[in-house]
Amino acid sequence: MGKRLILAATGLLVGAASADWRLVWSDEFNGTELDASKWGYEQGFIRNSEYQFYTNLPENVCLENGCLVLQGRRVQLKNPDYVPGETNDWKRARAVLAITSGSVNTRHRFAFTYGRVECRAKVPARKGSWPAIWTLGANIGEDGWPKCGEIDILEFYGQMPDKVTCNVHGQSVETGKHATPGSSELRGKTPADGFHVFAMEWTAQEVVCYYDGIRYGAFPLEAYGDAFEKPHYILLNLALGADWMMPESEVEVDDGTRFEVDWIRVYQKESPVADDRSGTVSANSASSK
């Protein structure tokens, strides 16, 4: 606990020169409850035909020993949105909730343009676990996805425990359709063996991702219009399988199916270089869906 507080006070960076950066937002998760001024919850079936139903319940989202814990659970509950005979909407087609989990984000509370994000976290090596640290454009309510832009600082798949990935998504200015360069992968690591620092630097020209200071992904941004020139908000979630990934029965959900986040911090340049644009920070700026 003491080390974590010292790091916060000094603004120490992992894998970057601290002199050029200033801390503009952070959460050390040292309290007893999630800070409602910084975070909101996703609830329900949300995206990607994933199996988990997100809740705001303490068994799925809590603070424990100075960490945010997103915990997967096996349950047998009625789906409150179930519609008998539904075939077109996967969120309403499931009568029973078999898995619950947690997802939190800073939408409507904090958004930023350009800077460096660092997050010290531990991922679960459980089959089907899909924890992520990422951002979405705060204009998603008006422009939708993928036009709003998405930065995947970390995606980890529990069934592939020696690999971490990062990526960006946007809308092509040429085709008007979803575009992505494809994930960059770093193999030969063991991210589930303890806490590691996942980082991302975002400028007007590119997004660069790091694992424990190792640079392993760089993505030019000119192909996506202004999606990465506008504020983004932060998301932390633990997805658990999807119908395109594996059968629901094969997803491993037990007490160890937990995504632990020690801290997350956002930095921006004190003096942006001449060929970049200065970063911005905004509160309560994200638009409603």
Which residues fall in each region the model found?
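Hydrophobic h-region of N-terminal signal peptides that target proteins for export
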Residues: 10-18
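General helical structural elements
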Residues: 7-8, 269
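Bacterial N-terminal signal peptides that target proteins for export
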Residues: 1-6
